[in-house]
């Protein structure tokens, strides 16, 4: 099954300085519907609380407040899988409370969007799974693959092009996911 790594990184960053990080932080150019039409069935969504509300993020990059329309679209597609990450890299001051908020929010999403299979819920700072995944995810993207120093400078788009043909078996196997940049 094809999965998109950092699914929502096609969105525009909210802070001006984030534009300088696009070669390394942007992992998708296609919007949600185009990703789905290209065969993506597994979506990687990252959240963090910023100023008291949930935001779509990728590490330090803020894409703005969580828009529930995203989940409605995914639910309408039907038979899709979502991995939700609490993308807080460093351990917060009150980690247990933060995890409780995350799990409560996850429960809300699961109940509101029955067309989505929430397959994974990870708290980033401890990389701990809070759901039991049914699908084996093969990470095949810029942040996990070994690369030469000059490949790092070229960014995620170059690297996605370089590894585009890898993991074809996982894409054709419904029990596995090849998580890729720039699907």
Question: Where on the chain are the PLM-derived regions?
Answer:
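Long, acidic (Asp/Glu-rich), low-complexity accessory segments flanking structured domains
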Residues: 1-42, 49-81, 89-94, 116-183
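A surface/extracellular/periplasmic glyco- and lipid-processing/surface-interacting theme
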Residues: 95-115
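Short, solvent-exposed turn/loop segments enriched in Gly/Ser/Thr/Pro and often Arg
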Residues: 85
